[in-house]
Amino acid sequence: MKNFFFHAPHSALSAKKSIRKNTFPSGASFRAVKKALLLLLLFASSLFAQDTAGLSAPGRMRTADEGFASEEFRRGVQAYYRGAFNEAILQFERSLSYKSDDNLILDWLGKAYYRSGLEGEALASWKRAYENGYGGILMQNRIEVVSERRVTGDAYGKDARYTEAGSFPGMNGDVLVFSEPVSSLPLADGTLWVVAYGSNELLKINVNGTVVLRAEGPINGFDRPLDVIALQSGNMLVSESAGDRLSLLNPDGKFIKYIGSKGRGVGQCVGPQYLAEDENGNIYVTDYGNSRVDVFDKDGNALFYFGRAQNGFAGFQGPTGIAAVSGGIYVADNVTGGIYQFDTAGNFIRTLVREKTFRFPESMKAWNGFLVVCDSNKVISVDLETGATYESAKTGNAPSRLTSAVPDANGNVLVTDMKSNEVYVMTKMQELVGGLFVQIERVNADKFPLVVVELSVENRRRESVVGLGEENFYLTEGKRPVLQQKLIGAASNNKIEDITIIIDRSKESAAYGAQIESAVRSLSSAMKGEGTLRIVCAGAVPATEYKGSPRAAEKFGINVLKTPVSAEVPLDLALRLAANDLINAEAKRAVVFLSAGGVTQNAFKKYGLSELTAYFNNNAIAFSPVLLTQGAADPEIAYLEENTKGKSYYVFRQEGLAPVVDDLRNLPVGRYQLSYMSSLNTDMGRAFLPIEAETYLMNRSGRDESGYFAPLE
């Protein structure tokens, strides 16, 4: 409970002076003093009662209104933890009607509004409590973060400046951990593979810098490994610059086979450098010794090479970094200092970045419309459209040779420094200063004193923080450490996804019945019988038409739908209905919207776009439209897709829709479940028990405070 400091009223101070001057005051003076002190005590008790929701009244009997307020508050907390946020809002509003300025009720009312997607109302409630002196820095930070998130912006762009948040050094005291890190491959669970050129190995490292796995390649080991990429097949590919070959590994780093050999013919290479894979699964390798790019198919069969002089292009002199983006192949040359664009057949298209722009470009990765290039001690962002360059990070004046910069699952940029023998974790300055955004989302005390807590951990840009371990969390109850704290699980490790498919029943989309059937069947089959599939029809009155195993929908027919085609479709109600059923679903959950891309009149009459995106984001629900036509979707659908997790797909895209489910499964979800044994007195289940959670990661931390009720006895 927050302590309140106040000045005594002037009359009370005068009364105290009177007591000091007169040992035996007159009867009238004594009554005045007594009255003033009584008013003072009542004022103090009323101040302290503003954070109790009527659950307690220190030094006096509770009033009837306080009793009613506490009962409604209890029901509100229980509804909140059930995921019934609208019900929780009603209960907290009722509680507030009995205690109109209670800060604890205002805090929880704001939480319920926030989870319901009504962020404006949440902020108003929190600000009211904060202005009453409640919450301190913790409440102030929450208000700032939520306010900032309502202003959308690019997570990575030309103005993004990154600074070091921590590092993984190659030496731990006198112990060698790895030598000369040259590239890295971040994974969806927060871990990363690091290629160690000097120690000839591949290391898997968690977010705390602990090596959890080492891979040394085939029996005879790697021969100066230089780059690693993840293939669409799920396997990994490593280039061996001294071995003049590529090594194919399984996801656990086990060797499968070699690709390529030493030489100058097709399928051969001398000093292979960096790797890329295009949308068709073809593999591109910068062949430094042969001054060209070698191309293999997805099975490792040699196709061709390119890089010799052609119209408008003088030929490679020292090809290094390479990236495949939307049908274009981009190659950096460390002799000419430029970046060149080709098509997938090796035909020269243009010089994206003029020569002599870079001093010594190395690895090059695509990220959000930019190429991220390492050049000496700098990380440079290159606009894919214009070729304009922007400095995104710099290591300073110490000896440095940055060789790769790759975005990870937590919104950081992982930078390998071969010369200083470190892997830097770089983040935006405001993230480093602002810390982590931690929320206690659910507390289950049904088996008290065993308590299970569900937490979400995000950065200030609403990006999930994944890969945390038990050592990253510290739980307390009433500021005292809990007993037997354990990390039960992390959502990022969950391989099961619950999916709700919304079928647009507008007249426009109804003309694409065959496409809808194909999409539902493909998505259902891709779920492989795991998780729960729901089908919601967006008609004049949205309705859930199916809930159960995905297997039953693998032979879906459009004729089984009961919801009629409608000229007007309240899409907002369909989206809310779909999301409501996912609140208590698997930790990984998503809505897939099948539509021709248009919206009807009054599609967002009850709920606005910002409220819908907040509802999805604040409950970790991804949104992916599958368009039945090749045209662009209406701006409303595009807004929903751009401001939630997930992305848009075309129903008949070359890769099919099966990878959509994998894409959704691989989205980062920063939710964690911990347990502990409580030592608090429940007062027969009537006491509101406190719980505090702190999360630490490198130089950042975050905190949240909440509470719960044990079962009534």
What are these regions (language model features)?
Residues E431-G434, N444-V451, E642, F652-E713:
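C-terminal "exit" segments of structured domains
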Residues P399-L436:
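Blade-level signature of beta-propeller repeat domains, shared across WD40, Kelch, NHL, RCC1
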